């Protein structure tokens, strides 16, 4: 009686070829500033900081892209709160950094050291001999 299973297992190359052609499913989050961030579908529950504001990957509006040439499927999920977390207890530094005062002297010279032109020629002869 013949075995119902073939003597050789089916080639895995066909499955690998199909997996390579399959588009990567990703999630798009549209931020209030106008930027768009893309995340892998399996990347959920993580946060990121963009332009000083913290965002969650489970944002209010997200889109799932199913393939290269397919139109996106838009989904508006009900908001569970703000996607931007701003804790009022944390002191935020001023985003504008103060610039150093401009000096009148040359920035390339150190005022405590004498100019190299003022050093005697005998010093240089002694130094390099």
Swiss-Prot record:
Region spans: Transactivation: 115-129
A GO biological-process term: symbiont-mediated suppression of host innate immune response
Biased composition, class Low complexity, residue ranges: 1-12
Biased composition (Polar residues): 99-109
Primary localisation category: host cell
Changes after translation: Phosphorylated.
Compartments where located: Host nucleus; Host cytoplasm
GO molecular function, one term: structural molecule activity
Residue interval(s) of motif Nuclear localization signal: 13-28
Residue ranges, annotated region (Disordered): 1-23, 73-117
The keyword Transmembrane helix is annotated on this UniProt entry: no
unnamed Zn finger ranges: 33-50
InterPro entries according to UniProt: Gemini_AL2
Sequence ranges of Basic residues compositional bias: 13-23
Annotated GO CC locations: host cell cytoplasm; host cell nucleus; viral capsid
Domain of life: Viruses
Keywords assigned by UniProt, alphabetized: Activator, DNA-binding, Host cytoplasm, Host nucleus, Host-virus interaction, Inhibition of host innate immune response by virus, Metal-binding, Phosphoprotein, Suppressor of RNA silencing, Viral immunoevasion, Zinc, Zinc-finger
Subunit record text: Monomer. Homodimer. Homooligomer. Self-interaction correlates with nuclear localization and efficient activation of transcription. Monomers suppress local silencing by interacting with and inactivating host adenosine kinase 2 (ADK2) in the cytoplasm. Interacts with and inhibits host SNF1 kinase. Binds to ssDNA.
Function of the protein: Strong activator of the late viral genes promoters. Enhances the expression of the capsid protein and nuclear shuttle protein. Acts as a suppressor of RNA-mediated gene silencing, also known as post-transcriptional gene silencing (PTGS), a mechanism of plant viral defense that limits the accumulation of viral RNAs. Suppresses the host RNA silencing by inhibiting adenosine kinase 2 (ADK2), a kinase involved in a general methylation pathway.
Stated family: Belongs to the geminiviridae transcriptional activator protein family.
This protein's domain notes: The zinc finger and the transactivation region are involved in PTGS suppression.
Protein name stated in the entry: Transcriptional activator protein
Lineage: Viruses, Monodnaviria, Shotokuvirae, Cressdnaviricota, Repensiviricetes
């Amino acid at each position: 009686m013949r075995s119902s299973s073939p003597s050789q297992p089916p080639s895995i190359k066909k499955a690998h070829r199909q997996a390579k052609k399959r588009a990567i499913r990703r999630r798009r989050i549209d931020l209030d500033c106008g930027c768009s961030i893309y995340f892998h579908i399996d990347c959920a529950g993580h946060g990121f900081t963009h332009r000083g504001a913290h965002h969650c990957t489970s944002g209010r509006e997200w889109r799932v892209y199913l393939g290269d040439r397919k139109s996106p499927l838009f989904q508006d999920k009900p908001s569970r709160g703000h996607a931007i977390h701003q804790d009022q207890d944390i002191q935020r530094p001023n985003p504008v950094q103060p610039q150093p005062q401009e000096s009148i002297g040359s920035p390339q010279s150190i005022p405590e050291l004498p100019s190299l032109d003022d050093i005697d020629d005998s010093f240089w002869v002694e130094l390099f001999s």
